[in-house]
Structure formats: C-alpha cells, structure tokens
Amino acid sequence: MLQKLYVFFRKETVLSIAVILALLSMFWVRPDKAYFTYIDFRTLGLLFCLMAIVAGLKAVGVFDILAQKLLMGTSGTVGVIRLLVLLCFFLSMVITNDVALITFVPLALIIVHKLPKELGNYWLLKIVAMQTIAANLGSMLTPIGNPQNLYLYARAGMSAAELITLMLPYSATALILLLIWIQVAAAKAPHVCSLEKDKTLLGFSDRKELNMEYLAAYLILFTICLLTVARIIPYQIPLVLVLIYMLLRNRENISRVDYSLLATFIALFIFIGNLGRIPQFSSFLERIMAGRETLTAVLASQIMSNVPAALLLSGFTDNYRALIVGTNIGGLGTLIASMASLISFKYIAKENRNLRGKYLGIFTASNIIFMIFMLILYFFLR
C-alpha cells in the first residue's frame, strides 16, 4: 500500500501536494456548503473541453500532418531547427504549451538523430530547451494558451483583446530573443553537411487519411469553445456537446484528458477557499502582496509552479493583470516553474538518463537569461 502511494506521489506530485494541502486546511475550516462556492466550474468545464478537443485533433493526426508539410517546405538544418521552435511558440497559443511540447519535442528528437552525429549532439539539448521556452512564452499571449491564463482571464473579466494587448510586448520580445538564440547557436554549430529532407528522413511514416468526421466535429467544438472564452455562450453548452460527442462517437478520447490537472485545480480551489476564511492568514498574504503582485507571482511560481501560484494568489488580490504577467514570467526559471517543462525533461531522461544533468544546466541558464529580459521589460512597462 505504501509503495503504491509512493509511486502515485512521484507520478502525480503536484496533485498529491494539492490534495494534502486541501485536507490540512479542513482542520481549520470544516467542510460545509460554502465549499461549493470555492470551485470555478466555468474554468474547469472549459479546461476539460479544450483538453478533450486538442487530444482528439492530435489523435486524428492533424498536428503531424501540419508539421510534415511545413518541414518539407523548409531548407537547411537551421531552417528546420527554427521551424521546430516556432511551431512550439505559435501553436502553443492555441493547443496549450504542454500539448505543443508533447507533439513537437519527439519530432525534434527524431530529426536530430537524422543529423550527422557531431551536429546532432550539438543540437540535441539546445533544441529541446528552446522548444520548452518557446512553448511557455508563446502560450502566454492567449486566454487558452495555458491553464493559468484561462483561469485568471475568467477571474479578471477581461476580453481576449485586453489579455493579448497586455502580454503582446512580452511575447514579441520572447520571439525576438528566441530567433537571436537560434542564430547565435547556429553560428557556433559544427560545419558539416546539411540535413537532406525527405519524408522518411524527417521521421514521418505514411499515415492513413484523416478521419474527416472527427476533424470536422472537433473543429466545430473548438469554435464553440472559443465563443465561450469570448463569453458569447455559456460554458455548459460546449461541455455538454463535447461529452455527448465523445460518448456517442469517440469514447477512446475520454481517457486522453488530463484528469489529474482537473483534480489539482479542485484541490487547490478548496485549499485557497479555506485560507480565505482564516482571517490571520488572509490579512498576512494581502499585506505581503500589496503592490508586489507580479514579483510575488514570479517567486511563488519557482517553488510551486505557475498554475498553483495563480490559483493561490488570486484569492488575495484583485490585481489579476499583475498576476497574469507574474505567473507567465514565473513559468521561466526552475524546472518546476511551469509543469510543461517537466514534459521536455522526461523526454530527455528517456532519451539518455546521463544527459539529465547537462540538460538541466542548459535549461536553467537559458531560462534565467530569458527571465531577466522579461523582468527588465516588466519594470520598463509598469
């Protein structure tokens, strides 16, 4: 039993800690009807729908085909590297940062192994670190790019245009820095033959044709979700439609949803709600954060990750714009600052466990550099 709990804790560390915190908070605030008011059902419903839709589109093969067509039209090793990074940056705005990494990091590893050994070894860790930063910083531009944006955007009552305007300077700066990094890295790369591209070399096998029914259905459902994000229709409509469609036509997709993330949200909602009913803690945190919401969010994200930080801190301030900036910048830094970063780390560990330390060094150093630039921009804009 203890062994099973240990295995579960290692696999779902954030969820486990969130549940423990929620349970501990119940000693101070006994369960009652007010618990139901803690939970943001709109955010949970939208998050479920978006995860289900993106999982469905990924299973159909939409992203593989898109990547294949783009890569086949790109010339040279540096061009392919640049495109793999930019795919993470731009598509994370729509399919979320974690899905972008799950989709394109394996593709990058396949392509790197097709390079001459010296060149492949040079790019292996760098491109994964680049993709991770690109996904985290690209996703901050839209309400649906990452979970903390979706939640804080809803709490703030902002329009999509307001959030995009708020984060555009940061995303634009991040894009410029990424392109500079790629060019600097390319200039230092070993001078060996370029990547010759064909369908097999790029790691794509022949695929069966797209299931047009699934593709059309999930694109329609995605459009309905966007209408909900824009507050044109209530969240219950896409939630019911997604559930009905999956139950009737695509049941296997139900298992592809990240339920541990939804459970983490629920546990943290309970924990934060209970803390808000403890006057001493509530007043203490409000004093600590007053006028320092962004920096508090950046620091908190380094320890507990930016999604839990967004959920926790939102209970003690109404300066949601500062939290949006802080939790997005806070996704840089430590490996756990953004849980999406762990996805890339796991791929590297699976590739070669001996590379974990070296990757962590490259990842941390590059994250700190990007964070410094983002913080300089924040102080300039405030």
Residue ranges and their predicted role:
Residues 90-140, 151, 311-324, 353, ...:
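Hydrophobic transmembrane alpha-helices that form the pore/transport pathway of multi-pass ion
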Residues 5-11, 33-43, 160-170, 208-210, ...:
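Interfacial loop-to-helix junctions that mark the boundaries of transmembrane helices
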Residues 38, 60, 64-69, 218-318:
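Transmembrane helical segments that form the transport core of multi-pass membrane transport proteins
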Residues 1-17, 76-77, 207-217, 361:
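N-terminal membrane topogenic signal
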Residues 3-34, 44-61, 185-188, 224-252, ...:
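Structural signal for alpha-helical transmembrane segments and their membrane-water exit/capping regions
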Residues 78-83, 116-130, 158-168, 319-331, ...:
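Membrane-interface alpha-helices at helix entry/exit sites of multi-pass transporters
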